[in-house]
Amino acid sequence: MATDDKILLRLANRVGIMGLLMLILPPLLAAWVYRGEAGESFSFLTHTLSELGRYDSSRLAVLINGGMFFGGLALVVSFSSRALSGRSTPISVSLAISGILLSLSVAACGLFPVNVGALHSHAMTALYVMTPVCALFYCFAILRDIPPRWGVLPALAAAGCALALLLDPDRELMLMDRYAYGLFGADRPTIWWPALTGWLLVLFVGIWLFYALILMRRRH
């Protein structure tokens, strides 16, 4: 491999890891300082990612939305750099495509927070649709040529969570601004399954993208 290619791939690795950190760390910080409209603390069991990115009620909403947008774009750059390298194969390109499309969907959710209404609903719905689509590309690459086979598990789990949210009959209502507050007020249930499922989706997508970055690095 040429020296320039090595430098490019090393930079792509660092950009990808930085992108993942921008997706992971902001929700933890924002949840820590969050106070809802009813004065309640944040719970990953009852509050959604959309609420954490709501500008009027979340103190660090700009960190959440900026992290998703710029983190998603950083991952797009990372996967694209690997796909365009001289040693790419059809299998590695398939792996990169899944990462690029999924990262773009994540970036769109950060660009359009819940305060913008319909655009946020469209962005989240696109994420729910693209997750199983990207999982097909990813699983094809893993099962065809890139062991170990258990690497498909986070993608399959993410696809399952995304489909559950996509097929929920109340999906459009749940993606509306202040829907949870109007539904529960200050008395939220111990577990609100749409919120928990949404965070499981975020968790599995994060593991999936991290593992995809590792696989792409190994193949180069």
Residue spans for each PLM region:
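N-terminal signal-anchor transmembrane alpha helix
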Residues: 7-36
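Hydrophobic cores of alpha-helical transmembrane segments in multi-pass inner/ER membrane proteins
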Residues: 20, 67-77, 129-138, 200-215
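C-terminal TM-helix exit segments that contain a strictly Trp-centered aromatic cap at the helix terminus
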Residues: 25-35, 108-113, 160-175
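Interfacial/capping segments of alpha-helical transmembrane domains
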Residues: 31-47
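Interfacial helix-start motif at the membrane-water boundary
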Residues: 50-73
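Membrane-interfacial loop-to-transmembrane alpha-helix junctions, especially the N-terminal start
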Residues: 89-99, 147-155
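Membrane-proximal helix-loop-helix units in multi-pass membrane proteins
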Residues: 99-149
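Terminal transmembrane helical module of multi-pass membrane proteins
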Residues: 138-220
